[in-house]
Amino acid sequence: MSRIVSLSSPDGLTVTLRLPAADGSIAMPEVISFGPSEASDAPIIERASRINGMDEAVASAVLLPTGGMGFFGWPAICGHRSGRDFVLGFCNWTAEESEGRLALAATDTVARMSLRLTLSAHKGGVVSSQVCLTNDGDAPYQLDRCMAGSFPTLAEDATVESFTGMWGREFQTRREKLGTGIWLQENRRGRTSHDRFPMLFVESANQRFGVALGFSGNHQIVIDRCDDGRRLVHMGELFEPGEMLLDPGESYLSPLAYAGADSAAFHSFVRQELITWPGDVMTPRPVTLNTWEGNYFDHKVASLKDQASKAAELGIERFVLDDGWFARRDDDTTSLGDWDIDTTKYPDGLAPLVDHVTSLGMEFGLWFEPEMVNPTSRLFETHPEWVLQVEGRPLRLSRHQLVLDLTRSEVADYLFAKIDSLLSSHDISCIKWDMNRDLTHVGGRDGKAATARQMRALYGLMDRIRRAHPKVEIESCASGGGRVDYGVLKYTHRVWTSDCTDALERLEIQHGASKFFPPELLGAHVSASPNHQTGRQLSLSFRSLVAMAYHFGVELNPLNMTLPEQDELAQFIALHKRLRKLLHAPGTQFRLDPVDGRYVWGAASAERIAVIVAQGSQMVGEQPAPLRLPTHITQFGGRWRIADRTPQQPDFIRISEGQSDLLAGKIDFSLVSLTSAGLPLPMLRPESALLIELEPTTGDPDHG
């Protein structure tokens, strides 16, 4: 007899499975239902065999299908032992059920492989899948593919929403209708990438869910259509040729693959479980000044101290010293890997600057790029063998950099010692951990592909630093948003969303990124105008409001601002501090899909609703549609009014008398009506933004 097992996440997804009979039958666990908890009551009836198919019934929607079970779709696990044992068929399934966890195990006695699949329920309504595959034979097994998880869709027309882009234009939303074949995404860049993020949503008439891979290296996502019209979403690590060879008794442990119902579920999971804060509590996210665009490599201690003093006057709370502080680092061609303080720029070391910053009540942060080395460096001159390379092949430079082989213990020890020394001798609160190139020719000392080992070694180094300095936060940066995922976020506390600080470009970047990442983790800075990446000239108001809801910061030299600009920026910093508790509170955020270039996002509580409206480079048309808010925002009910607006004189194209009264708070309205009728706001000029704050007009707690 087959056995029914299930796993439920609180207020989230439920997975109900049929385990194959424990009689030696070769099969994989069949998915009876996957979705909201009520789906677990689905009728559980064995299906007949296919027409003109195998005599035995072979389920279509199973976890991790393999060819050995008579499955003709895309196999989730495959490999061989010197050309033999190429068919995998698991049997004798067992299940261990505990609160929030379902561990399934099976063996293949012919291929001499064993499989353990662990499904876990996480806070926020997210479930995860992880696979452990072990070679029980007496000869090596070449593992070509092993997905971390498989998640089924309904048998109906579906659309996939994925995220593509490039450097400076990350998280561009892409929607495609799924056809009858395979939808495939592969990333071979050795880091998460700017163009193929390991996360997506699948949506049909009666189902929507998202998946995310907790891994920062090469990955593969496949959506395969089954014989019965359903689809399987597979995701896992992508191996280089010959990379994953399992010796006898050796196991492969996959990354975690996550599934959740919506953005709110993923946000809740990240906040409650994935990210770990110093002291186990997130403090208000400090307004940050990062020195890169204000100084580049031109470090002068006196000027940096003056910038810090001005930053403190403006209300900034964290001062991060970016690239250029270490010896001979006058441009990006030299000295990566050395990590010795430049005694020419800093004759007394970093301590005077660090002490000055902290004396002003600000935190001090420091930039590193630990994984990289310049050929022009003392480290490379001493240890050229320490870089990833393929014997007989030329070293491939990118941004004048080579990649250190972190799988060598001596390399990891060297980097830890350098970082540990600086953190131990200075009052440093955070690290900006950069990584500015893709990986090519990723060969280890044994001559074999080492991409998978390199990523795990990186996690090990980050974990080692976290354990040695538990009060220090880490920001993940990789040429901007090139390493933003649920793997690196286990060891970090913030991500640099993009190297592009142009507020107009940031609208779509932040819109896409915020679907999987809470806003307080996404670095968003006010930069100079004209912008250094695009040359666009944008108002300080627009730049500030676009960054307002995220981990707010500044990317410029404040000494170069006029006094009126400094005053205006200080007002926006004060506004962010007043609203950040609301903007970053769990379960309060919302975002609307952009229409005619108009982006809308914000946060809500029973006492206050903050709505940011930003108009892109195009005009809406004759007039904008009324602003409708989602039901989880209007659920507070009662009558509300606009209590405040920023700026006080918004850049409208035209405005009616009634709209003026509305913005002045003279008109109240039913909050519930905003779900259907909407709020008739005036038309903003292109490249301008408005923040409105709503408050209830009644004293009743339910605002009724």
Predicted regions located by residue number:
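C-terminal beta-sandwich/jelly-roll accessory domains of carbohydrate-active enzymes
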Residues: 618-704
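Short, well-ordered beta-strand segments enriched in hydrophobic/aromatic residues
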Residues: 127-135, 474, 608-616
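Aromatic-lined carbohydrate-binding/catalytic grooves of carbohydrate-active enzymes
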Residues: 280-417, 430
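Glycine-rich, aromatic-flanked loop segments that form ligand/cofactor-binding clefts
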Residues: 57-90, 198, 203-219, 260-279, ...
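Short Pro-Gly-centered flexible turn/kink motifs
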Residues: 244-262, 686-694
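Carbohydrate-binding surface patches
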Residues: 194, 199-200, 205, 593-635
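Active-site neighborhood of glycoside hydrolase catalytic domains
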Residues: 347-349, 381-541, 551-556, 560
